[in-house]
Amino acid sequence: MSNKLETSIKAFTEKDQFSHGKYNFPALFTVFGTPKSGKSYYVFNLLKEIKDNFDRIIIYLGTKDAAAGFLGLADKDAKKKPQINVLFKYDANDLYAYFKKLETEQLQLIEANKKPKRVLLVFDDILGLHGFMTTNRAKPSPIHEISANYRHLGLSVIITSQSYMDVIKPIRALNFKYCIITSVGMKDLKLIGEEHENLYFSGKDIIEIFKNIRSHGIGNCMLISNDDDDLNRFWWIHKNGEITNIKPL
């Protein structure tokens, strides 16, 4: 499959926002989990449930371990939406060019009172690849601009990482809409507590909540929702898919 991204998109008349269970789109998801913690499994199942709401899905994979599953998401009939591209090579210049083209075309649709295309970008364990998260003033990483402007373009993004602290702070603590944590080390967990504590939940509370969730086994995750107020910020994703609110300790 080609690693080049075609940049032309067509207008559509559907609403550019939709909901799926707890989640409201467009959205930026961050998903953190150590190997074998169920991180990619959760993302794969989420994609299976929401994919038909999108016109295009682009998936960057850091490894080929899960390639067969993600490739299987595409419909055998190429004329049916969504168009799905699975890429194994990350090129910052290619992504930036695609994003700027998408930005221009989406804004043209919005200005013409038409609904923008629904596009989903998935970055699965590619944080270590050159130019993805690192940045400098002369040449910022495309993900910085994407994370800051996705809402205005009807664009949704999923970023997965084995480590919380490896993701830059604007994304891990500010710009995301939903943060899902399957399993992390204590250094990451302490930082999560520090960056997400509020008037109702202390950093220690957050750590204890996560430990309790994880004690129920793989498949149980903690959700931090920036789509809710501070009192309803923390949620339990159960192994059976049910999502329940966590009240202050």
Predicted regions and their residues:
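Short secondary-structure boundary/capping segments
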Residues: 73-77, 196
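Compositionally biased low-complexity segments enriched in polar/charged residues
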Residues: 2, 73, 81-83, 216
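Conserved P-loop NTPase motor cores
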Residues: 29-49, 62-64, 90-202
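Conserved GTP-binding G-domain of TRAFAC-class P-loop NTPases and closely related GTPase folds
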Residues: 171-249
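AAA+/P-loop NTPase substrate/partner-engagement loops
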Residues: 52-74, 95
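Pre-Walker A adenine-sensing motif
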Residues: 3-23, 44
